[in-house]
Amino acid sequence: MKSIINLLAGSAIVLTMTTAAFADGNVIGVSWSNFQEERWKTDEAAMKAAIEANGDTYISADAQASAAKQLTDVESLIAQGANALVILSVDSGAVGAAVDKAAAEGIPVLGYDRLIEDDRAFYLTFDNKGVGRIIAETVKAVQPEGNYAIIKGDKGDPNALFLLEGMMEVIGADVEAGKIKIVGEAFTDGWKPDNAQKNMEQILTAADNKVDAVLAENDGMAGGVIAALSAQGLNIPVGGQDGDHAALNRVARGTQTVSVWKDARALGKAAGDIAAMLAEGKSMTEIPGAVKWSGGAKGVEMNAIFLDPTPITKDNINVVIDAGHIAKDKVCEGAMDGVNGC
């Protein structure tokens, strides 16, 4: 994980291809897990733009959080003539059948953001363990001890475990020493904010509201957590990630401590460019910036690219404004005093 490639917007590393190389054009099929979360729409726009800029055709399907539908979606994308597939998996355990279908047709696969632990798939994501570390470090700096709750993502998503591993690297020693006590920890079906809110409500009830900080594994769930806290009149440090617009506004308002921004535009563009190269017949080892990685649960060695995330707090809200990720009036609405950029 030390060989991390920074592909944020405006970075020096750009995956380039000539127009001539795509004179005939290829078809890039994208299987999305679901569009429930705000961020995937941003990813899609960037990915589609990159694919079309390369002279290729974008086709897609939305699995609507169903692993079974994702398999039929992949079959449909193959039938429509996809020359390469980008898959944001619903369930890491079930997606193998989709990879088998693609491999049988000689179609390369890019596992997008979520790990598909199969050496036939290229892996493109952010450094999710690093994201977990950043969330925990930022919250711990504000609340170095006391009762913590951890709201994890979906149990079937490897990212939930990578994020947790990163968090525990930061707070694990303090947990063992008794400085930090984990009073509640729960997986959240589908990463859904409503489910996260229910999980947090149950933790608050069990802990008699004695919770001092919350580590949430994404911004949508952080929103659910904060709703549960607000209902009890609590305002405590809460960390999340994705750089969702609503979360960034919560950071400015002071109800969320940090949102680790993973620039979806950079990830989407990189996916479009990598898929184009794979569709043209380049091997995974020929992808610029690719590294060998075997940090998954099964230890499978894979070709991967990891992008660097950026923590956003009240001290650097200006970063997302300056990058054009969110308008100043939107992020700064109701902002507390002392927010840099507002």
Label every model-predicted segment.
Residues S3-N6, A21-C342:
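A residue-level marker of the well-folded mature domains of exported/periplasmic proteins
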Residues V14-F22:
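C-terminal segment of classical bacterial N-terminal signal peptides
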Residues K2-G10, V14:
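Sec-dependent signal peptide recognition
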